Every structure is written in C-alpha cells, then in structure tokens.
Curated annotation (Swiss-Prot):
Main location: nucleus
Residues spanning the signal sequence: none
Quaternary assembly: Interacts with GSP1.
Family affiliation: Belongs to the MOG1 family.
Native source organism of the sequence: Saccharomyces cerevisiae (strain ATCC 204508 / S288c)
Functional description taken from the UniProt entry: Involved in the Ran-GTPase system for nuclear protein import and poly(A)+ mRNA export.
Subcellular location, record wording: Nucleus
CDD domains referenced in this protein's UniProt entry, alphabetically: Mog1
Lyase is among the record's keywords: no
One Gene Ontology biological process: mRNA transport
Keyword annotations from UniProtKB, A to Z: mRNA transport, Nucleus, Protein transport, Transport
Designated gene of the protein: MOG1
Protein name: Nuclear import protein MOG1
Domain of life: Eukaryota
Length: 218
C-alpha cells in the first residue's frame, strides 16, 4: 500500500482556554465498543456501536479507514456520543519531527487546513506511551465548503501512533461538529460532555490498536 506523506501547513494559534467537563449521566465509557478489522484485517482497534464503514457508502482513499455515525435520535447507547461524529484512521509517512508532540501538532495543522482554517486550540494533550503514542483534543472554527458564512465550530480528538519500524505515522481523528447551543457553551469556556466521551473513545482506540499483519507496510 502506498503511504502518502503529510505536508506542513500552518502554525497553531492560541485561542481562549476551555474546560473539558464530563456531566453525561450514566456514561459507560468503553463497555459497548466493538473490535473492528482495518485494512483488510491487517490492523485491529475498536469503534462504537452504530458507526458504519463509510466505504460501503462512498469511495475512501486506500490509506484511510472511515467510520460514520449512523445512529438515530431515538436510539440510546448510553456512551455520551450523539449522531454526527465521524472517525478517520489514516496511514501517513513519518514526518521529520523527533519530538512526538511536535509531530502531533504537525498532523493537526494538516487536518485543520483541510477544514479551511489555520486557527485551532489545543484543549487537552496526553502522552499515552513515551515516543510512540500521543493524544489530544483540539477545537477549530471550520469553513464549510470554503465559505466563512457557513463556519462551524468543530472539536477533534486526534491521536498519533508512531510505527517507527514501518516509517509510518498512524493518525486517528474523531470529528465532533458542535451544534449552535454547544458552540455557545464552548464560547463560555466549557465543552459539552460528549467531547469528553469522544476523548475517552480516542484513547481506547489507541490502547487497543494492534498491527496483525505487517505485510501491509511491505
């Protein structure tokens, strides 16, 4: 499989600080997440119930695995998620950054540029495993279809898993488009509880990420 190299786009811009909160009653965390096979079974991790493989709906790049939320409003999963989140796993060539946090920022910059903005704020950052695994939660104002008048506040959980033996950076991103009410809450320096649920999901996806077949990187 051809692994594409991410390109350096922009520098992070510090915005106002928000507080990450968890107020979702009955949140059960990872209890209901299910194991999935990625890239033809070469990699495994977990995704929540109610998320479907986007390749069954549309074409997805070879380096990516995409899962979209297909839940309905009347369904109850008790995991803190809503109905509009999406998950992307991307295999990229390792960027020339020895510091893992700097490499993570590099990939975040690419993601935000794809969303039509260069301004983003890191809400939370964690080293999961020294030198190889880093996670964070960022917030941006994305321009839909490049139109500022359609701007939407988006929170993104971003994980970097560095597979040094394969010269590969695995980037997992979970997108959370905020409603107007949630965006208003965020502007008051608080985030909706589902952002915390997304971050817990991201960290579990990283913990349970396993390479099963190394020929994927041959």
């Amino acid at each position: 499989m051809k692994i594409e190299k991410a390109s350096h786009i922009s520098q992070p811009v510090q915005l106002s600080t928000c507080t990450l909160i968890d107020t979702y009653p009955g949140h059960q965390g990872s209890m209901n997440n299910k194991e999935v096979e990625l890239y033809g079974g070469a990699i495994t991790t977990v995704v929540p119930p109610g998320f479907i493989d986007a390749s069954t709906l549309r074409e997805v790049p070879d380096t990516q695995e995409v899962y979209v939320n297909s839940r309905r409003d009347e369904e109850e999963f008790e995991d803190g998620l809503a109905t509009n989140e999406s998950i992307i796993v991307d295999l990229l060539e390792t960027v020339d950054k020895s510091d893992l946090k700097e490499a993570w920022q590099f990939h975040v910059e690419d993601l935000t540029e794809l969303n039509g903005t260069t301004k983003w704020e890191a809400l939370q950052e964690d080293t999961v495993q020294q030198g190889t695994k880093f996670t964070g939660l960022v917030m941006e104002v994305a321009n839909k279809w490049g139109k500022p008048d359609l701007a939407q506040t988006v929170v993104i959980g971003v994980a970097l898993i560095r597979l040094t033996q394969f010269d590969t950076d695995v980037v997992i991103s979970i997108n959370v488009p905020l409603t107007k009410e949630e965006a208003s809450q965020a502007s008051n320096k608080e985030l909706p509880a589902r952002c915390h649920a997304v971050y817990q999901l991201l960290q579990e996806m990283v913990r349970k990420f396993h390479v099963v077949d190394t020929s994927l990187f041959a």
